[in-house]
Design a protein with these regions (language model features):
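Amphipathic alpha-helical "coupling" segments that flank catalytic cores
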Residues: 1-689
Length: 689
């Protein structure tokens, strides 16, 4: 049985950036595990720990020694290893010397590409304790730290100054230098509750020692659970429920080693402000959890977390109440000031903001979007004037004080201000919903005008940025065009909107006045859209070949595309599917090889099998036409599946490329007719068996 032991590494430092703590913790674990894999060291399980002042990794049952192994070095080919006289060539002798061996110690390796000289050397495995320091140093140097810093007189660099390091393998310290500090077994507890050194007897004592002696909850996830539970209990104590968002929960966990809840209060007059304003003020500025009532409205309370068990918690409460008061007062001031000017009165001020140098100002974008919105509304038989009005106002809340202070409230404040201005309810709702979906899986607009405006705004942005030559590459997508494109597709598909996305693109491109190659831009955008559609389909559980089968017939209405791919997925489950897919592939290959144009009409046929196929194909053609008109592609494919036996009989009994030209043309025309019936839905020859 291979000897093993537990490994603990902890790096203690000044408070780490809270928004990157979890990412740093996971990256350190991943890097160390990658180093162990590279060193051929096995282990049982591994866990990462992270608090504001430490990153740690605990690995169970880590192999104590590398296994001995045979290292094989390959040298020159045998044909180059000997001279004309049969003596070893310089290449062979040089290879032997580089291995520290004689020519006689070399062996031969036969492969399908030839025979080679090789040298096999037994390498004794190293002790894990000797390998760990370099693995850790490399892991730390590869952490995703945007800006590293130096401290004292050290050359070491890290996200924050390092104060201690624990490195234990079993109960033994691996003595080394990590980022300018000597490793040992002494950790440190809470900065105020337990600032003294904490002796870690063994790796598995780490978590309990910090908890019991150090007032530190080392496990990030456990701190999140504790914070969530404590916030919920504290909210219940004042008759409410904690409003907890995951991002803030993570950030608060990254700010506290020993989180203690504190309930604070604010003046109920502030509840007259939009709820989102209060929530943003408390969350963004103060890292507070708001408290809601059972109807979903806010209560005049908040929950904050102190990183200390205070002997005077009332002072912490009052201090936080004093701090949040001016923040809420500022929000109240912005709300009152902004309402002195309507959104409509702010439209002209959009001319002061450049959207993109080739695409003009936000006012010019607004005018383009309004035209697109009117076009879309007309096609959907929606209220054109409401769509134009919603588009006209869509970006005006960017000119308000509130959105200037809280950018994440764009659209939300537009809705509130539009309602306050007396705008139509659908226009007001569209101010917020045209930004939907905001993230992957997020809700699409619920209102028709919001759907129209969302499409118009995103299409204009997509077409415009591509026309300016700013095409996303790799992970660079400054205008979030991937998200915008997926948003277009989701709005169309998930709301049952049967618009042609290429027609919308053409309408958008026609509005730009700057010089660009329209045809080239159009094709690039179309490719980009369908690349996003492929990703969407794969996420929905469709396969790549099902997507390619539908893409081959070039449907440009995403909703129609989804109806087709759903039908193809169902079709391929039929017992006839594999045979028909193979037959279609054969038909397409036959038609491609034809040296002459294939006649549109089918002439005389002589064999019973081909006459039967013609009759069956004519019958199916008649029956699927109304199904295609209804976009009932599933029933249409089910009907075409009934052709299997007739198609198989044709290929079993008929030679297509007969010497009789007229007969050959008739048979080719018959196959073209059959192929075209399937191609009205999808190219099922793309389906893999």
């Amino acid at each position: 049985m291979t000897a093993s032991n537990h490994l603990l590494f902890e790096l203690g430092c000044e408070e780490l950036p809270p928004k990157s703590l979890k990412k740093l913790s996971q990256a350190l674990l991943d890097n160390i595990l990658a180093g162990l894999k590279e060193a051929d060291l096995t282990y049982n399980q591994a866990r990462a720990y992270a608090t504001p002042r430490r990153l740690a990794v605990l690995i169970d049952d880590l192999q104590s020694f590398q296994a001995d192994k045979i290292v094989e070095k390959r040298g020159p080919a045998v044909q180059a290893a000997f001279g004309p006289d049969g003596a070893p060539s310089k290449a062979a002798q040089g290879f032997a010397a580089s291995c520290g061996a004689t020519f006689e110690q070399l062996e031969r390796l036969e492969t399908d590409k030839g025979t080679w000289l090789i040298f096999k050397q037994a390498v004794k495995g190293q002790a894990t304790a000797d390998l760990i320091p370099d693995i850790i140093r490399k892991s730390l140097s590869n952490l995703p730290i945007a800006k590293r810093m130096r401290w004292g007189n050290f050359d070491a660099e890290f996200a924050r100054p390092v104060h201690w390091a624990v490195l234990l393998f079993g109960e033994q310290v691996i003595a080394t230098d990590i980022l300018g500090v000597n490793t040992g077994r002494n950790s440190r507890g809470h900065r105020f509750h337990a600032p003294q050194d904490l002796n870690i007897a063994s790796p598995h004592d780490y978590v309990d020692t910090l908890l019991q002696q150090g007032k530190v909850i080392a496990d990030f996830e456990q701190r999140m659970i504790r914070i969530r539970d404590a916030a919920n209990q504290a909210a219940a104590n004042v008759g409410g429920m904690a409003h907890i968002e995951d991002d803030l929960l993570e950030e608060v966990a990254a700010l506290n080693e020993w989180p203690v809840p504190v309930v604070g209060n604010f003046d109920a007059r502030f509840l007259e402000l939009p709820m989102e304003v209060l929530i943003t003020t408390m969350q963004s500025n103060q890292k507070y959890f708001p408290v809601k009532n059972d109807q979903g409205g806010l209560l005049p309370h908040f929950i904050t977390f102190a990183n200390i068990e205070s002997s005077n918690p009332a002072s912490i409460q009052h201090g936080n109440e004093r701090v949040v008061l001016p923040r809420l007062a500022d929000a109240e001031f912005f709300w009152k000031q902004d309402r002195k000017q309507s959104l409509a009165d702010r439209v002209e001020s959009l001319a002061s903001i450049v959207f993109q140098k080739d695409l003009g100002t936000l006012l010019e974008k607004t005018e383009r979007v309004a035209k697109l919105a009117a076009l879309i509304a007309g096609q959907l038989q929606a209220d054109v004037e409401l769509a134009k009005r919603a588009a006209l106002l869509a970006k005006t809340d960017l000119m308000t004080n509130m959105v200037g202070e809280f950018a994440n409230l764009q659209g939300i404040m537009g809705r509130y201000y539009a309602l306050a201005d007396g705008e139509h309810a659908e226009v007001a709702l569209a101010q917020e919903e045209h930004y939907f979906p905001k993230q992957s899986g997020g809700a699409t607009p619920s209102g028709k005008i919001g759907q129209i405006l969302s499409l118009a705004e995103k299409i204009d942005t997509l077409a415009g940025i591509f026309s300016a030559g700013l095409i996303p590459t790799g992970d660079k997508d400054p205008y979030a065009l991937r998200r915008a494109t997926l948003g277009i597709l989701r709005v169309l598909i998930e709301n049952g909107i049967a618009l042609d996305v290429v027609e919308l693109l053409d309408a958008a491109l026609d509005q730009f006045s700057h010089s660009f190659n329209k045809g080239e831009t159009r094709q690039r955008v179309v490719d980009f859209i369908f690349d996003r559609l492929k990703g969407y389909c794969l996420d929905q559980g469709y396969s790549s070949d099902e997507f390619e089968a539908v893409l081959a017939v070039n449907p440009t209405r995403p909703l129609d595309f989804m109806l087709r791919i759903r039908a193809v997925q169902t079709f391929r489950q039929l017992p006839e599917a594999e045979s028909l897919a193979a037959a279609n592939k054969r038909i397409i290959n036959i038609l491609k090889k034809s040296e002459h144009a294939i006649p549109e009409t089918i002439g005389t046929l002589v064999e019973a099998a081909e006459k039967n196929l013609l009759a069956a194909a004519e019958a199916s053609d008649t029956e699927i036409l109304p199904l295609l008109a209804e976009q009932n592609y599933q029933l249409a494919l089910n009907r075409l599946a009934q052709l299997r036996d007739t198609v198989d009989a044709f290929f079993d009994n008929v030679m297509v490329n007969t010497d009789d030209v007229a007969l050959r043309n008739s048979r080719l025309a018959l196959l073209a007719m059959l192929s075209n019936q399937f191609l009205k839905i999808a190219d099922i020859s793309k389906l893999q068996s």
